[in-house]
């Protein structure tokens, strides 16, 4: 009886594999035979897959584990960097609101614009090393640089923004100076500046640039002087003219620069400390009136420096100056790009590409 059952099983076994045998000879397999294969083939394949990891050599297993660790570390590092940028952007946005409030109460737009400009305007494109190349690196906070002749009065700007720096200690001075400058332009009615942040500060006064890097108001050859200074920074004739348009804000004080009247009908009274001579009648409003006033030269109470007059005397400069006197929209557009470029000169960023505030 047992022999009969064994014979029956032996006879049935070939039918389970008959489809494979037939296919190997070019004959189509019966549908019922294909179905019969599935319960046999799939469990075997699954068992093979489950057993595969156990066949890794020790070195391979170690390498696989190391690779996963590196990936996890990279992911954690990227997450930390992203969180740091988000935190930095949040602090800068909060600081920007404080700057806006400061501007409302002190009307210090001109001196904050100057603060950002003079920190970045020391850049030398011919020097590659940071911070020797100068530029927007926060060095203007040190006394040795504040005492440069071109920076007369900027200690007052530092005093204005220092409480904001104390409130947000993670913001670099370099970022704070440029944030204050761009915000002052915007709050005075000027264009929105497409700013980048993440600038790194220098750490000591020994890293300050030498004196003499900034423009002089009354050189013997004004156009040549402007080109020498701005070309060193990597800026061109168009950018020289459009950036000069920021003189639509502010006044020149003779006790600081040696230029201008002690006071005029436009500066005797009004917001802020009285005195000085302004380039425009509404010297807290950012517009293209600077170019109009220089071109017309009709108001003796308004200031025109030799470097201002050069914009309409030099034939190349004049093309741009005439354009901006007629077209404020063009002035705003070109100014926004030039100001953003100036604010980045010489800067070293963390992260290297910097980051924006997105509104």
Swiss-Prot record:
Site (Transition state stabilizer): residue numbering on this chain: 114
Catalytic activity line of the entry = L-ascorbate + H2O2 = L-dehydroascorbate + 2 H2O
Report the GO molecular function annotations: heme binding; L-ascorbate peroxidase activity; metal ion binding; peroxidase activity
Give the binding site residues for K(+): 248, 280, 287
Q: Where is the composition biased (Basic and acidic residues)?
A: 252-266
Q: What is its main location?
A: plastid
GO CC terms, sorted: chloroplast stroma
Q: What conditions trigger expression of this protein?
A: Induced by salt stress. Down-regulated by hydrogen peroxide in leaves.
Textual note on the cofactor: Binds 1 heme b (iron(II)-protoporphyrin IX) group.
Indicate the enzyme's highest-level EC class.
oxidoreductase
| Residues annotated as catalytic | 118
**In which tissues does this protein get expressed?**
Expressed in roots, leaves, stems and flowers.
A GO biological process held by the record = hydrogen peroxide catabolic process
Q: Which UniProt keywords apply?
A: Calcium, Chloroplast, Heme, Hydrogen peroxide, Iron, Metal-binding, Oxidoreductase, Peroxidase, Plastid, Potassium, Transit peptide
- Region of interest: Disordered: 251-277
Q: Which cofactor does it need?
A: heme b
Show the SUPFAM superfamilies listed in the entry: Heme-dependent peroxidases (SSF48113)
E.C. numbers = 1.11.1.11
Query: What family is reported?
Result: Belongs to the peroxidase family. Ascorbate peroxidase subfamily.
Task: Print the miscellaneous field.
Answer: Binds one cation per subunit; probably K(+), but might also be Ca(2+).
Q: What's the stated role of this polypeptide?
A: Plays a key role in hydrogen peroxide removal.
Q: What is this protein called?
A: Probable L-ascorbate peroxidase 7, chloroplastic
Source species taxonomy = Eukaryota, Viridiplantae, Streptophyta, Embryophyta, Tracheophyta
